[in-house]
Amino acid sequence: MRIVKIEVPVYRYAELNDKVKEVVKDHILSATRDAQGFTDSVKHTLDVLGIEKAEVYYSLGNCQGDGLCFTGSITWNKAIEILYIKESIAKLNKDFIKSCEDCIYSINFYKFDRMYNHCNTVTVEFEDSNWMYAEDFTKLKDIFLTWYKALCGKFEHQGYKWFYEISEEDVVEYCDNNDIEFTANGDVFVEPT
């Protein structure tokens, strides 16, 4: 047997070339940004908005059909606290609004397409909406779907940032705080003991 000593150049993050820095960023993103953390963040926001029994679905792989959606329900009283919904409903017939206040307890978001996870795979239904005229029902449904799609779009945008973007400052801070060094190809250097 023989023992061989190999010398390996080791670099701090700031010393790496730009191509290798991108490799390091990808490694750090995968180590620090987990799917559960993103899901919990979205669920927390939905909870603050008053969405009950929320389930979040997403596929953010930069592919056709990608997106984010959620299911759950919100009470009428919580829904009209949301500025967009409140302002949009105020433009509807006053008698119709009064009837909605009296008859609709919850608004439910249901997923009807299990293959994809974008906002167009969910529909909105109103508890006890049989009394509504088709035109009024369509207007009300459009208000909620417009709000829903805008909210999903914001979450989707945040998701892409969560999984695919990290600032240079955050990478430097992470590497410095953890005293991480790298080989020339961006692999983390672990000094043998």
Per-region residue spans from a language model:
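Alpha-helical propensity feature that highlights long, continuous alpha-helices across diverse contexts
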Residues: M1-T193
